[in-house]
Amino acid sequence: MKNAFKDALKAGRPQIGLWLGLANSYSAELVAGAGFDWLLIDGEHAPNNVQTVLTQLQAIAPYPSQPVVRPSWNDPVQIKQLLDVGAQTLLVPMVQNADEARDAVAATRYPPAGIRGVGSALARASRWNRIPDYLHEANDAMCVLVQIETREAMSNLASILDVDGIDGVFIGPADLSADMGFAGNPQHPAVQAAIENAIVQIRAAGKAPGILMANEALAKRYLELGALFVAVGVDTTLLARGAEALAARFGAEKKLSGASGVY
């Protein structure tokens, strides 16, 4: 079994991604052919469930873009279901310390290395037991990425990086900036300093640093610092801003206004 995304991170090849929040297999397939290295199927803030994640995995499968799935929480039951429908790479949100990082890894591994329940006869991941030796090879194909999104997590970064089985650490700029007292302003100098220091520390530990940043200059800056998986946009934002720009060119006025948001 192979995991092309995990292999790319191990080889130190930067991977450029797009965030998927439309929770729709049709739009997922549309962007799967756009040329991104990876696509994040968001189960934390988008209206996804196991079934919608499954259909998006199926839609993306024929294309070179690699799927990454974010569960809503570091929950072994939910993680088990996502792995069974075919997710190999998980982005686990709001990991605060090494114990929680170890829990995330354990949820992705079959015993004795972890606690993943065995149900391969029912699982798309094993192609319903048509993949020879799936139960013995699946553990090595798993890619576990954990999110650090608070000052507490930042203070525990060194111990998180020591956890065996963690392939990458993703910095969540939106929640981090809020936790630092700068909600909606991840570009604040204090937040940027924390992000940049974390990227350097993660890379120095031999793990892959990751982040979501739609600001092109900042995204390129993070890549220069050593970030290896960087999402540079969100499908909902692309659709909303693109639709607004098209309408504006023909004289339409925006009916709603509000905060510009982080992405």
Swiss-Prot record:
Pfam families: HpcH_HpaI. It catalyses: 4-hydroxy-2-oxoheptanedioate = succinate semialdehyde + pyruvate. It comes from the Bacteria. This is 4-hydroxy-2-oxo-heptane-1,7-dioate aldolase. Substrate binds at residues 147, 174-175. The lineage of its organism: Bacteria, Pseudomonadati, Pseudomonadota, Gammaproteobacteria, Enterobacterales. Coiled coil: none annotated. Pathway: Aromatic compound metabolism; 4-hydroxyphenylacetate degradation; pyruvate and succinate semialdehyde from 4-hydroxyphenylacetate: step 7/7. The record marks 70 as: Transition state stabilizer. The record marks 84 as: Increases basicity of active site His. GO terms for molecular function: 4-hydroxy-2-ketopimelate aldolase activity; metal ion binding. SUPFAM superfamilies: Phosphoenolpyruvate/pyruvate domain. Keywords: Aromatic hydrocarbons catabolism, Lyase, Metal-binding.
